Curated annotation (Swiss-Prot):
(2R)-2-phosphoglycerate binds at Q161, K334, R363, S364, K385. Belongs to the enolase family. The gene is eno. The active site is at E205 (proton donor), K334 (proton acceptor). Mg(2+) binds at D240, E283, D309. It comes from Saccharolobus solfataricus (strain ATCC 35092 / DSM 1617 / JCM 11322 / P2). One of its GO terms (biological process) is glycolytic process. This is Enolase. It is found in: Cytoplasm; Secreted; Cell surface. It catalyses: (2R)-2-phosphoglycerate = phosphoenolpyruvate + H2O. Pfam families: Enolase_C, Enolase_N. Catalyzes the reversible conversion of 2-phosphoglycerate (2-PG) into phosphoenolpyruvate (PEP). It is essential for the degradation of carbohydrates via glycolysis. Its cofactor is Mg(2+). Binds a second Mg(2+) ion via substrate during catalysis.
Amino acid sequence: MINRFSIEKVKGLEIVDSRGNPTIRVFIRTSDGVESFGDAPAGASKGTREAVEVRDENGLTVKRAVDIVNYIIDPALHGIDVREQGIIDKLLKDIDSTENKSKLGGNTIIATSIAALKTASKALGLEVFKYISGPRLPKIPIPLLNIINGGLHAGNKLKIQEFIIVPIKFNTFKEALFAAIDVYRTLKGLITERYGKIYTAVGDEGGFSPPLEDTREALDLIYTSINNAGYEGKIYMGMDAAGSDFYDSKKEKYIIDGRELDPNQLLEFYLDLVKQYPIVYLEDPFEENSFDMFSQLQNKLSSTIITGDDLYTTNIKYLKIGIEKRSTKGVIVKPNQVGTISETFEFTNLARRNSMKLITSHRSGETEDNFIADFAVGIESDFIKVGAPARGERTSKYNKLLEIENKFGLEYEGKYFYL
């Protein structure tokens, strides 16, 4: 008797991401004819420990990745029960046999891993988030909306990569999201008034990139927008510094706002900002090997969620170091950083056991697939980062969360969140 869940076909397809770059989509079909797909997102700012993508012609094609799926992965997965996520992911890792997934490619592997999970949930007639969460009743995570871009995501002189708003004190996700959209619109008007309409064009993640040079200029703009929109005390602020991107390893200095700061001076810089503005979230404040500096900052800012992205790269090996050193309260969760869904689950489970906040995140190069929204709800993520409320590949994730809330009546994480 044929198992209706057995994998019959795995197929790769070269598609286009939100930055106009090629990426890979992997389809998996079962013997019962059930089919779904997984897309590989791509980051602009990457940690050095991330899984390596397979690309050709200076990144202009992923034809080799498609061939790997069609000629290596397809026969290897043929006949395996699509519900066996752990077996599928282990087989992919074994075939690859490298620590950084460089043989098959992190992009190839994560697209296949996502496709397996989505196909299994579809075959069982379950929503993806329900397939992940099981019998537990999860909540809708708090959105972290990146509304001003700097660093590698922008063409201005800001060194901080993302300036974020955090709508916490609302009863529903819908209320929180639409309040954040009010602030986004208010900011757009403020930028138009001060700098001209040309600077309201949006960047890779939907945020604005006004001609700013100083961190406080950006924070002032957002703080004013929050107050003008009437959400003081309900919408807070955050930053993704992407500290590795403005760290000069030769000088051992951070180059920011026209100054060269040593690690301790940068720590004081952040302490001053948190005193001046309602900042509750700070991601990658230092370069990716500075576990001790992260720890010092978190110790001084007990009410702020210091978070590691490049510090951990969704890798349990580095998370264990952060736990031992008490480096952060929060962890970024990006499945494509580590390469498989199973490894991502291991990472989130360890973080949860150590009372750390989960922040599920997109990448700057995304597709219209809304898998990450389902994934965030399913793993009971505290927060979700999918960009500004603009551009289809970002809004598709917000719309999926609105749909889940409306259809299943899930409560909003922010309703119960205390600072």
